[in-house]
Amino acid sequence: MTHLLTIDPTLIDWSRAQFALTAIYHWLFVPLTLGLALIMGIMETCYYRTGKQFWKDTAIFWQRLFGVNFAMGVATGIILEFEFGSNWSNYSWFVGDIFGAPLAIEGIVAFFMESTFVAVMYFGWQKVSRGFHLASTWLTGLGATISAWWILVANAWMQYPVGCEFNPDTVRNEMTSFMDVALSPFAVDKFFHTVTSTWVIGAVFVCAVSGWYLLKRREQEMARQSIKIASIVGIVASVLTMATGDFSAVKVAETQPMKLAAMEALYDGGEGVALTAVAAVNPFQQPDYSKGGEAPLRIAIPNGLSLLATHKADGFVPGVNDLLNGYTRADGTRELSAEEKMERGRRAISTLAEYRKLKAADANDKRLPELAEQLKLDMPYFGYGYIKDRAELVPYIPVNFYAFRVMVGVGTLLMLFFLVIGHVAWRKNITSKYRWLYVAALVMLPLTYLASEAGWIVAELGRQPWAIQDMLPTVAAVSDLKSGSVAFTFFLFLVLFTVLLVAEVSIMCRVIRNYNAEKQQ
């Protein structure tokens, strides 16, 4: 992969842009699938327990919207997986044995499970018993959640690669422990934080659609009961999302400290570091962090970041400059400087090339074990050998800084929203005098999606320049393609995904607009 040191930078940019485009569009559909699956399961359970036609009609209505969204999620997800082979073939070669395993399990087990039971859920109302149909609805949601588990396991491994070992004979990383990969603490935290956030989106969606009906004075009983269920789901999910987000922050601080420093625009670390609430970070320019100091017009919570990252008020949190220059940890171990890591990375690349050359000439060469041992020592810094300048190791601070605040700010607002609408739904009679609340529900829907996408932006852009944290930089993961061809497919996908999005929104709006509970009976 040494030729990748001179690869066209525009190819990397277009490949990243295309993957980001596909992922962002895909994530517009996935969270609603997971969120609605839970709520429609609860509604059908109400039908099973009461036998009331009202609950059956309500469950069928939300299942129709679920179906439209489910189909779009599948379509965009398939394209996303193919991009690993087309645009990121070096990545696929280097770690395909590990990364491919959870994706294969997801496709063989989880996707077939949800695809099977979603058919029963849609077409089995008059053909199977109420109990079997209820089980099919819940199993559809369970299958979708299991799919999310394996996909998030794969993504978490990119953030925190464990359970693997580099084989110099094949120039590939090979899995040494499936359980370490599947049950990585990073994967567990990421799964619960992501899935609980999708329940929030599902709850907001139900509140927004129900709010529209109440504004139009239509299907008011269905809307009221839907809001009651959605508000409870939303409150519980919001609390869980915040709690799991806290756990995730600790893991990020331990395994991706540069990401945390970028999220906080923290240039110089220390003990008892404050958490920035707001600051004036230029969104169009990487700040000059080398001069130290802090972002202008900063309002911060004393000791907040240390509490968030270490759960200690006086905990040490490294800043960008600490990570670039090297520092001594609390346990006495030393974090190498950027230049030291880059030097050891270049040595690993050189040692690997020498090992391969000797192995090809004489597989019994006595120098091979010594080279293999040296490579093993330097392999943790292998990816740094492809970094030309220490500045490349710093993610784009403005995007990470603002995206994190959008995620947290909207998340906090959502908690307040669910508390208010839940109070109105359960303690008062929802009437036209709460029109402002229904309008608020409609406004919260796009804000919720914005927060969800912002979370993924922090997760992925904050990892840059790495495709796999500390192991493989993006520049070494990309396929050797013409940048023009990738640019062309970028705009092709942009048009295709936009058409799919417009089609979904149009179909959903038509289903919502044309729904009439009396005609369903």
Where are these regions (language model features)?
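Polytopic transmembrane helical bundles with strong interfacial aromatic enrichment
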Residues: 2-521
